[in-house]
Amino acid sequence: EYTMIYDMQIDEKAGHVYLLPWNAKSIFVYNLQGEYLKDIPLNGKYEKLIVPKGKFKVDAEKNRVAVVLLPFNYLPVVAWVQDMEGNFINEVPMNHLKVKPDFSNEVVSTKAASDALDVFLCTFWELRKDTLYHLNLEDGKLHPKFTMNFGQRKIAIHDYHEFPRHYVGALTNPVQVGDRTYQTEG
């Protein structure tokens, strides 16, 4: 029925389970008994849009879905807010966030923000200073929330996570151990 689920959300109040597969055109909606209910289309504005790796947050009461995807440089947007029928309400262009197509990159979210989707774009080979953002479900904009100052040091592979009362930044350095082999150390 589905393979390679990249993100999910359980909404006990609405009685729904939402599943986002890898390379998705829609979010699958099930009830809490596991019965399929419907799809939420994700490409309402851009017919050929496929979410390669993405995170989402559904607000069933407000009929809104926030989506952030791994912003490959050929895609039109990095994030958007839409209704449950796939109609875009707001969108965020990629600008400085775009990355070369490389599936070692990740979209990170703990879904800790109550009124937004917290998200960090973790780039593995394209190292750069970046920020943990909130995609606000009301205004559809990315708001910066947390970053680390690397100063004059080399930028390490890093990711940021949000929790209810704090942020965590994790640093990792790749070490070449063979001709084409790396391992990481923290």
Identify the meaning behind each predicted range.
Residues 1-186:
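Eukaryotic scaffold repeat domains enriched in small/polar residues
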